[in-house]
Amino acid sequence: MIRVGIVGYGTIGKRIADAVVAQDDMKIAGVLKVSPDYEAKVAVSRGFPVYTLPDRVEKFKKAGIEPAGTIEDLIKASDVVVDASPEDVGRENKEKYYQRYDKPVIFQGGEEADVAEVSFNALANYEEARGKRYVRVVSCNTTGITRVLTSLTLNGVGIKKARIFIARRGADPKEHKKGPINDVVPNPATVPSHHGPDVQTILRNVDIVTMAVAVPVTIMHMHMAYIELDSAYPKDQVIEAFAKTPRIFLADVGAGFQSLAQVIEYARDLGRPRGDFPEVAVFRDSVTTHGNELYLMYGVHQESIVVPENIDAIRSIFGTLPKWRSIEKTDKSLKLTTEGKRYG
Amino acid sequence: MIRVGIVGYGTIGKRIADAVVAQDDMKIAGVLKVSPDYEAKVAVSRGFPVYTLPDRVEKFKKAGIEPAGTIEDLIKASDVVVDASPEDVGRENKEKYYQRYDKPVIFQGGEEADVAEVSFNALANYEEARGKRYVRVVSCNTTGITRVLTSLTLNGVGIKKARIFIARRGADPKEHKKGPINDVVPNPATVPSHHGPDVQTILRNVDIVTMAVAVPVTIMHMHMAYIELDSAYPKDQVIEAFAKTPRIFLADVGAGFQSLAQVIEYARDLGRPRGDFPEVAVFRDSVTTHGNELYLMYGVHQESIVVPENIDAIRSIFGTLPKWRSIEKTDKSLKLTTEGKRYG
């Protein structure tokens, strides 16, 4: 059993913790919280040992939570640390704590690529995290793009260049202070947005440019993709590629999937934890070929898409399972769509 | 003085009416309203003769508005009719009324292209409406795209193909029943959206594909454009083209234009009627060249962008002014941005 310490039990960390619990080859060593808020109490109720920073111990005690120890105690109790701290805090934690212990650490996409030795996506480069000390699971949008592009190339559809146009959700559901409201915000106004270069930390040779705007939505990101292929391919070959690629879901308008909200409604109806949808939701009706051009729209659930990637990153680091067996195990344990999927 | 009858005094019609009032070569013959609501009362307070449909006369009287006559009386009192009815109602009006009178009619972009002999954009094909009986001013998004592409070609920047990705405003500010709220809706899920073919009703040979999603915004549409040019051009040449093209405004992030809402705030600060912004608002920072590729983002104010186009369409039909003199006269009378603009 791999003992996993989760540093940062927020939007991503709490989901990874629950995903770890669903595995039979790993378990939670503990989770680190900075504030003794309702999320900390949820961690306690889940039975997770709750650690905190040295200067927060008294605060936790006052709030009725007895900390299991400090961050360094958590690192010592873990075989691997998953850092899901807010942007840039992961790097601070590395300098302050992780460098002093000989434990592998997985960072999230909020950190710059050079925080780690390798940027990770299970479909694209599972093997590259093997034995690494520092691994970074790329961010939600980058994960979505990487899955779509890798699905194509794994299935014989060659890519000449990808131009992706992103309508980003402005905030997560719980972020009550973030906007926009009734506005569309270039994010950034310059081209490219960071997503293109970020994809290239994994798919090093892909010709990709991305543009992004933020919109008043908390539910999911939406991508409009224009991809030039290396020749003309039948649309059915592209659809078939998506249909058999794990962690891609084909949403049909005819089946009621007319928008991102309907994808999340489906997740809620399925009883998925927190109404999460870790698959890339490709709108099947949008998949269009036009000579050697491919168009498609897809949704990316920013809160959950990286969760299965973190689970696979753990197995990849320790080399306990090969790529496809890990992906399949993760998907089954998290009850992702497995019907028609080809694992290997 | 050209006497202009406005059929449909809603979002577009009321703006065209005010724009007509600002001209010294045309005047309002009257406006047609179907409901005696607050907009009808605004029309009365503006001093416009208010006409209605035959079966609505009593309703208007009960509401305290004495109609000046019926739609046929309005047609008779006009030299030209601008039909700004809801989608498809323009065509019904044509079949029911306009065909029986020998007066030119201008339709809006909500109607299909074949309602008219020519689709119109002042920059692109001003001369083609000359002497026509039925003219159609294309819709807001189509007008925005047509201006941007025409600005490039008029200034020596050749276009190979245009791929435009649109985050549409979900509703106008007054449309209280329309959505989405907290959702991104493929609009449509199929590719292309109608905008590409609609641009081709004016720029017949342009290779264009468009995709669109609707977002929870009432303020403006946002376009992300990817344009392949016929060779590499310096970015400055593109910026210069936009800078001197009438009805295109370059919004600098450094000057505070960080989003669409800031563009509208500027219009409000300028004291523009209804806070309108009929110019295409190009985010200067987004204009990027990359080999022969051009990227940019721009906002399109759906409520007002077609207003100056309708004024020019009237002059074009009657041949009272050549293209650039009409555009300049319209822009000055409506107090659009004229600094640095080249009219001719």
From Swiss-Prot, chains A, B:
GO terms for cellular component: cytoplasm. The keyword Hydrolase does not apply. NAD(+) binds at residues 11-12, 110, 169, 302. It is found in: Cytoplasm. CDD domains: GAPDH_II_C, GAPDH_II_N. GO terms for biological process: glycolytic process; lysine biosynthetic process via diaminopimelate. One of its GO terms (molecular function) is NAD binding. It catalyses: D-glyceraldehyde 3-phosphate + phosphate + NADP(+) = (2R)-3-phospho-glyceroyl phosphate + NADPH + H(+); D-glyceraldehyde 3-phosphate + phosphate + NAD(+) = (2R)-3-phospho-glyceroyl phosphate + NADH + H(+). InterPro entries: DapB_N, GlycerAld/Erythrose_P_DH, GlycerAld_3-P_DH_AS, GlycerAld_3-P_DH_cat, GlycerAld_3-P_DH_NAD(P)-bd, Glyceraldehyde-3-P_DH_2_arc, NAD(P)-bd_dom_sf. Pathway: Carbohydrate degradation; glycolysis; pyruvate from D-glyceraldehyde 3-phosphate: step 1/5. D-glyceraldehyde 3-phosphate binds at residues 139-141, 195-196. The active site is at 140 (nucleophile). Signal peptide: none annotated. The keyword Oxidoreductase applies. Its EC number is 1.2.1.59. It comes from the Archaea. Its main location: cytoplasm. SUPFAM superfamilies: Glyceraldehyde-3-phosphate dehydrogenase-like, C-terminal domain, NAD(P)-binding Rossmann-fold domains. Keywords: Cytoplasm, Glycolysis, NAD, NADP, Oxidoreductase. Coiled coil: none annotated. Homotetramer. HAMAP family: G3P_dehdrog_arch (MF_00559). This is Glyceraldehyde-3-phosphate dehydrogenase. It comes from Pyrobaculum neutrophilum (strain DSM 2338 / JCM 9278 / NBRC 100436 / V24Sta). The gene is gap.
